[in-house]
Structures are given as structure tokens and as C-alpha cells.
């Protein structure tokens, strides 16, 4: 099982590294012109990596990994909502600069997280990488939440005008579903989810440094 986990995390690391390298290279060569077609150049690989991340929930449910299910579920779900429900469904949003910024933040976090998880799967620890894994989220995660919120904000006019995912039913009962209201509710609840996930990540960080301090004393 350790071999399987290390291979899974290696695949994720390679995928996100390719995305990060592609985005960085395109920006260095084309400057701001690269922002507009970020989704068209790396969107398919990004979608593949996010679909693959469902396995991380299965790992927890099957007892392969001991991480908390709810924090992981919320992190996977928020990316699915933003990537597949919001960005993929609205072509006008795909060319926004905020999408490039969001993908950059996501992948800058993942190229740190996945090699750490890969090494942890085979009981290997590099202190610098471990410290970075338990510290970088303090900056990266709140920034990603802000970028996600702004992406939703930018998408609302398009969902409003195009009526994507909204519908009305006359029979057998009168029923109306207005999707922009759901996105607005999501924006209201998003800070609650962010605080919960940050508290879980902070607890992990605290436990790591406490263990490290005990080892030094011994």
C-alpha cells in the first residue's frame, strides 16, 4: 500500500508540476498575454488532477490514510465547485486574469504538498519540506479562498444572463431554481469553511512542532 500511495502522489506531483512550469514559462515568454488563455492551455490537465484527487477521499474511507475526512472533503469539494461548476461552464470566465492567479496559487501549494505526502507514505522526512508543508498554507490557503470568491463574483453576471443551471418547473408544482442564489449562499458560507480548514491545518502544524520539540529535548 505504501508503494501505491507513493506512486499516486508522484503522479499528482508530476501533473501539478507540469501545470506550474507551463504557466510560469508562458508568462515569462508572453507576459500578460498568457493570462487570457491559461485555461485553454492547462485546463484539461488541471481537470484530470482534480478528478484524481477523489481517490484521496477513498483512501481515508478505506483506512489507507489517517487524515480527517471532513477537512479533505471540503478542500476537494471547493475545487470541484470552482473548476467544474463555475469556470468550465462559463467560457467568458475562463479568460479572466483571476483564473490564472487561482491556478497559480493552487499549484504552488500542490507542488509542495504532494512531494511531502509522497515521502511521508514511505516514512521519509525532510525537515525543510515538512516545515514548508506545515507553514506555506498560512499564506496560500487564505489567498486561494479569496481568489475562489472573486472568481465566483466575476461569474455571477454570466450565470444571471445565460441562466446556466437555473430552471423553472410549472407542473406538477411551480418550482424555480435560480443558480446565482446558490453561488451567493456559497460565498456567504465560504469563510466558515475556510476557518474550519485553517483550524485543522493549524492543529496539524502545532502537533508537528510539538513532536519536533520533544525529539530535540530527548
Curated annotation (Swiss-Prot):
GO terms for biological process: fatty acid elongation; sphingolipid biosynthetic process; very long-chain fatty acid biosynthetic process. It is a multi-pass membrane protein. Its EC number is 4.2.1.134. The chain crosses the membrane at residues 7-29, 39-61, 68-87, 97-116, 137-159, 179-201. The keyword S-adenosyl-L-methionine does not apply. InterPro entries: Tyr_Pase-like_PTPLA (IPR007482). It is found in: Endoplasmic reticulum membrane. It comes from the Eukaryota. The active site is at residues 141, 148. It catalyses: a very-long-chain (3R)-3-hydroxyacyl-CoA = a very-long-chain (2E)-enoyl-CoA + H2O; (3R)-hydroxyhexadecanoyl-CoA = (2E)-hexadecenoyl-CoA + H2O. Pathway: Lipid metabolism; fatty acid biosynthesis. Residues 30-38, 88-96, 160-178 are lumenal. Keywords: Endoplasmic reticulum, Fatty acid biosynthesis, Fatty acid metabolism, Lipid biosynthesis, Lipid metabolism, Lyase, Membrane, Transmembrane, Transmembrane helix. One of its GO terms (cellular component) is endoplasmic reticulum. Residues 1-6, 62-67, 117-136, 202-218 are cytoplasmic. Its main location: endoplasmic reticulum. GO terms for molecular function: 3-hydroxyacyl-CoA dehydratase activity; enzyme binding; very-long-chain (3R)-3-hydroxyacyl-CoA dehydratase activity. It is an enzyme of class 4 (lyase). Catalyzes the third of the four reactions of the long-chain fatty acids elongation cycle. This endoplasmic reticulum-bound enzymatic process, allows the addition of two carbons to the chain of long- and very long-chain fatty acids/VLCFAs per cycle. This enzyme catalyzes the dehydration of the 3-hydroxyacyl-CoA intermediate into trans-2,3-enoyl-CoA, within each cycle of fatty acid elongation. Thereby, it participates in the production of VLCFAs of different chain lengths that are involved in multiple biological processes as precursors of membrane lipids and lipid mediators. Belongs to the very long-chain fatty acids dehydratase HACD family. This is Very-long-chain (3R)-3-hydroxyacyl-CoA dehydratase. It comes from Xenopus laevis.
Amino acid at each position: 500500500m505504501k508503494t501505491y500511495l507513493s506512486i499516486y502522489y508522484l503522479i499528482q506531483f508530476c501533473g501539478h508540476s507540469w501545470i506550474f512550469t507551463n504557466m510560469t514559462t508562458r508568462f515569462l515568454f508572453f507576459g500578460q498575454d498568457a493570462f487570457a488563455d491559461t485555461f485553454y492551455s492547462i485546463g484539461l490537465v488541471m481537470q484530470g488532477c482534480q478528478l484524481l484527487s477523489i481517490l484521496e477521499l477513498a483512501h481515508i474511507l478505506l483506512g489507507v490514510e489517517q487524515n480527517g475526512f471532513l477537512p479533505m472533503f471540503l478542500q476537494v469539494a471547493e475545487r470541484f465547485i470552482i473548476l467544474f461548476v463555475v469556470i468550465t461552464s462559463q467560457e467568458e470566465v475562463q479568460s479572466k486574469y483571476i483564473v490564472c492567479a487561482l491556478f497559480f496559487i493552487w499549484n504552488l501549494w500542490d507542488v509542495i504538498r504532494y512531494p511531502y505526502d509522497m515521502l511521508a507514505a514511505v516514512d521519509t522526512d525532510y525537515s525543510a519540506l515538512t516545515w514548508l508543508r506545515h507553514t506555506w498554507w498560512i499564506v496560500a490557503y487564505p489567498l486561494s479562498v479569496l481568489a475562489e470568491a472573486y472568481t465566483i463574483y466575476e461569474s455571477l453576471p454570466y450565470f444571471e444572463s445565460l441562466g446556466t443551471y437555473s430552471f423553472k418547473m410549472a407542473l406538477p408544482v411551480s418550482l424555480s431554481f435560480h443558480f446565482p442564489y446558490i453561488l451567493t449562499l456559497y460565498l456567504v458560507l465560504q469563510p466558515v469553511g475556510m476557518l474550519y480548514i485553517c483550524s485543522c491545518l493549524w492543529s496539524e502544524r502545532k502537533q508537528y512542532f510539538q513532536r519536533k520539540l520533544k525529539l530535540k529535548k530527548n
